[in-house]
């Protein structure tokens, strides 16, 4: 089946192309796109700072309606809404493998679960590492959406948390700091702008969550080696990421996590998709996260 898809090759823009969608496999569902979030990584890919990924991997913050179900899938039905991690979510229709989708009650941007799950997964992918440091001091570098979700997840445990950043001051209040004076047991790096171990002081056996793929300098490496640090890199391709998606759904549905204020702008797929990526790049006043809507 040939369908439309939005693609970037890293030349500063997205374009509409034709995508050949295969028949869904026995362990897949077919979905029709309803909403897809514009991720910062898509903007980085557009500007040439990342990738570009092949066409079949473009768009990953999906919400769709099921149109067909493989014979090995038994927990959903045709016509049901699902949040997807599968790709390409910028296509009009796409297939999603089992354990890469979660049924949701309605087509509302709060149920674009993949980016929420990314924030939760910063903690849950290596939960045992956090648990062995319970009661320690945590630094989150960055004050955007992922930082806020990660901070919310940390409320399930007992940590002293600082958030280092300059954005969303009204959201964070006194929890937001502009410089650090403490030594930390855990650092969650969503920025890549600081030297972890030199600019940011660490305690022995510290845990570093590198969420940006930062290049480590020699000075950092020496300090991290001296302090016997552990570094992990969370990924939505981890086998347990689906658990973070379920956690995101449950927190949102139960009212324990309010993400509505972050989804600030919707864009019509037929007439406004180019503006969606332009605003993702320029981030006009009041913009937090945008999403594309199919009729």
Feature locations, PLM:
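Glycine-rich beta-strand-centered segment in the early N-terminal region that forms part
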Residues: 20-37, 47-88
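Short glycine-/small-residue-rich Rossmann-like dinucleotide-binding loops
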Residues: 37, 44, 70, 191-192, ...
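NAD(P)H dinucleotide-binding glycine-rich loop of Rossmann-like/cofactor-binding domains
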Residues: 81-140
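Hydrophobic/small residue at the entry helix of a nucleotide-binding pocket
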Residues: 118, 145-146
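Adenosine-nucleotide cofactor-binding segment
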Residues: 121, 134-143, 151-198
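Glycine-rich phosphate-binding loop and adjacent beta-alpha segment
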Residues: 191-254, 295
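C-terminal hydrophobic helical "lid"/dimerization subdomain
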Residues: 242-295
């Amino acid at each position: 089946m040939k369908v439309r898809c939005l693609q970037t090759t890293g030349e500063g823009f997205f374009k509409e192309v034709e995508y050949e969608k295969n028949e869904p496999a026995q362990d897949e569902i077919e979905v029709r796109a309803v909403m897809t979030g514009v991720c910062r990584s898509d903007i980085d890919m557009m500007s040439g700072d990342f990738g570009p990924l092949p066409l079949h991997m473009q768009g990953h913050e999906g919400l769709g309606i099921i149109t067909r179900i493989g014979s090995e899938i038994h927990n959903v039905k045709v016509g049901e809404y699902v949040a997807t991690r599968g790709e390409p979510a910028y296509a009009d229709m796409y297939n999603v493998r089992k354990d890469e989708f979660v049924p949701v009650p309605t087509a509302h941007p709060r149920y674009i679960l993949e980016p929420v799950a990314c924030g939760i997964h910063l903690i849950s992918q290596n939960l045992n590492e956090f648990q062995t440091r319970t009661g320690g001091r945590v630094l989150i570098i960055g004050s955007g959406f992922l930082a806020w979700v990660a901070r919310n997840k940390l409320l399930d445990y007992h940590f002293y948390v600082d958030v280092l950043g300059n954005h969303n001051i009204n959201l964070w209040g006194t929890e937001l700091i502009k410089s650090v004076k403490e030594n930390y047991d855990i650092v969650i790096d969503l920025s890549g702008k600081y030297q972890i171990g030199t600019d940011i002081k660490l305690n022995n056996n510290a845990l570093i969550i590198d969420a940006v793929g930062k290049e480590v300098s020699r000075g950092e490496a020496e300090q991290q080696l001296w302090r016997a640090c552990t570094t992990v890199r969370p990924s939505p391709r981890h086998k347990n990421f689906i658990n973070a998606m379920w956690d995101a759904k449950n927190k949102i549905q139960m009212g324990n996590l309010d993400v509505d204020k972050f989804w600030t702008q919707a864009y019509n797929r037929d007439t406004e998709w180019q503006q969606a990526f332009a605003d993702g790049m320029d981030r006009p006043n009041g913009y937090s996260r945008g999403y594309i809507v199919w009729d």
